Regions:
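Intrinsically disordered, low-complexity, charged terminal extensions of DNA damage-control enzymes
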Residues: 1-2, 7, 169-280
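Catalytic cores of DNA base-excision repair glycosylases
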Residues: 1-181, 187-192, 196, 210, ...
Length: 280
């Protein structure tokens, strides 16, 4: 696929594009990221401008993409690179993992894509290929270390960055979670799941904490009161309606409109309190 962060640019710009795109792709699908990446890099074209950008402008460029701590960490990373690495993106996994918001996967993705190192990052797409090729079905027993040990199956290439992305593309576009396109797959002849005609991989059951909130909607002539959020870790420093966390029992006593919002680490149940008016 043509993706905006894959277009031919200078080496330094490629490093910046890789850094920004990998932050945006954390917990977000490619098709969602594309327009945000284009807008972000148009307005913030390099590490220097990112390190100096006003926080409000930064959040405006990120607005709607979610997981706003990524934007804050991305700016912190840019500041650290400019200050400690003379504006050059570090080119070792250990150094990259010292930067805010960069963990094992992101550091490996940057090494492969930006620096052409012989590394295959283990994302969900690569995991799915390995589980199907080796017919791994005991989800709770499959560790990251075990899956990493199986990556030798893919071999190596002199174009390591392109090769790593190609493998991830096979997972995204061919070895799909449902209805995989096995007849188009370049590795189906080595795939045990294909031979068994059994492609299902059960997802882990994930149970989030449930938290309860009351959102207070103050309005006057269709003008609404918003406040800067310094209270909650989610949507930090963004404008929200005044909101309090409440006990389950109190939430259940409320009568009126409610919202259910699913986040990565919790399920939010929000009561919309429209009774409040701004008094002149």
């Amino acid at each position: 696929r043509f993706l905006p962060w894959r277009k031919k640019v200078s080496k330094k710009q490629k490093e910046y594009f890789t850094l920004v795109s990998e932050f945006m792709l954390q917990q977000t699908q490619v098709k969602t990221v594309i327009p945000y990446f284009i807008n972000f890099t148009d307005k913030i074209p390099n590490l220097i401008s990112l390190s100096k950008i006003n926080d409000n402008l930064l959040m405006r460029c990120w607005e709607g993409l979610g997981y706003y701590s990524r934007a804050r960490n991305l700016k912190k990373t840019a500041i650290k690179i400019v200050k400690d690495y003379k504006g050059k993106l570090p080119n070792t996994i250990d150094e990259l993992k010292l930067l805010p918001g960069i963990g094992d996967y992101t550091s490996r993705a940057i090494m492969a894509i930006a620096f052409n190192k012989k590394i295959i990052p283990l994302d969900g797409n690569v995991e799915r290929i390995l589980k199907r090729v080796f017919y791994l079905r005991k989800e709770n027993e499959i560790t990251k270390d075990y899956l990493n040990s199986k990556k030798n199956f893919f071999g190596v290439s002199n174009r390591s960055g392109d090769y790593a992305q190609a493998i991830m593309e096979v997972g995204a576009l061919v070895c799909k979670p449902t209805n995989p396109l096995c007849l188009q797959c370049p590795i189906s002849k080595n795939c045990i799941s294909f031979k068994k005609k059994d492609f299902e991989i059960k997802a882990k059951n994930k149970f989030n904490k449930i938290k309860y909130f009351e959102a207070k909607i103050y309005n006057s002539k269709n003008k609404y009161l918003l406040i800067k959020n310094n209270k909650f870790n989610f949507l930090k420093n963004l404008l929200i309606f005044p909101m309090d966390e409440v006990k389950k029992e109190k939430f259940q006593s409320f009568v009126g409109q409610r919202l259910n919002v699913k986040m990565s680490n919790m399920d939010m149940k929000i009561f919309i309190n429209k009774k409040n008016k701004i008094n002149k």
